[in-house]
Amino acid sequence: MMEEILTSGDAPESFIGARYKDQLLTQELIDEKIKPAMEALDAIDPDQTMEYEVETRVGFGDLLPGVFGSTDLIGRIGNRAIVLDWKFGDGVMVEVEENPQLMFYAAAAMRTKEASWAFEGATEIEMVIVQPPEVRRWVTTPMRIARFEQELVQAVHAAEKPNAQLAVG
């Protein structure tokens, strides 16, 4: 739903009654989730200079064939790449620091033609989780994401072994 709202330029209220998966968009959801999420995006990019792509499929190509995901938003402001994830569910707040999902997206995006532009020459990578009414932000470096990628490659290869140790979770 956020993709449609952001790319259309229309007011969120124009989407009332629309369905996303099994969720009907109501004024209450706009007030409690969508508007706070858009305000968070404005706080991240107050000058409206960010270039961004929404809902981009990212993957590791030949490094890890078949390993991919879909980012909510990949962007760039100055020397900072941005990886943003919308969390609209109620319940447990998701922490952003060292968040494996966001680091996965950043590492995969760096190897994906359609998203790598946001990381080229970046000296910082900001991870953002927007979980209205909360916004959590963490700035890291391309070097940290490269280390995460190495850890991920080792974990995937270990999991592919015939007698791989199983883990709950």
Model-derived regions: residue spans:
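A cyclin-like helical interaction fold
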Residues: 33-44, 142-149, 169
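Mg2+/Mn2+-dependent nuclease catalytic core
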Residues: 48-166
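Metal-dependent nuclease catalytic cores that hydrolyze phosphodiester bonds in DNA/RNA
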Residues: 1-76, 80-81
